[in-house]
Amino acid sequence: FYDKYNKEVQIISIAIDFQGKSKVMPYINKLNLKFPTLIDKENITGELFGFKAVPNGIMIDEKGIISYKKIGKFDIRNEDIEKELINWITKSLYLESIDAKTINLKEDAINLFKKGLTYYDSNNIKLAIEYWKKSIEIDPDNYIIRKQIWAIENPEKFYTGTIDYNWQNDKLKKEKY
């Protein structure tokens, strides 16, 4: 997609990973991405655009106006999504309202997440995870935080090649934060 449309559109990706560059770079290198990837350790993107899960797609026109926002299950390899984006690029169409899928973020959960991130950055992983689990108790639909906990506790399910979505679904059914 990028090779075909890089003259018409700028593409960046944003990886939300609390563990940072060391966990993100192997994927970037494996995919041989030709566009920049920003690393969001603090989930600023989730707060800014109102999402609790990934992957997402947000298209911003040359005037800085968001004209497309798909929250969850964004995959450029999906034929329907690819067609929408091609139409947006070639015809400058507004595809979806910015407010169409904005999710209510819970301030107490965000504050607990940020406090946990402070402990994580101080290498107190155990206390960080405790705060993040409290955040999930308040906001059980926040899959970004939930999956980061899982990735820290079970790195082999996330960082050794293919992400194990079956394991994640089983874990989700068993968990009761």
What function would you assign to each model-found segment?
Residues 113, 146-149, 164:
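Alpha-solenoid helical repeat scaffolds
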Residues 29, 136-137:
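Conserved structural position within tetratricopeptide repeats
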Residues 94-95, 151-177:
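Alpha-helical linker/edge segments of TPR/alpha-solenoid repeat scaffolds
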Residues 61-130, 143, 153, 157-158:
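Thiol-/selenol-based redox modules, centered on thioredoxin-like
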Residues 1-15, 26-30:
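Conserved helix-turn-beta segment immediately C-terminal to the redox Cys motif
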Residues 25-62:
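Short, internal strand/loop/helix patches
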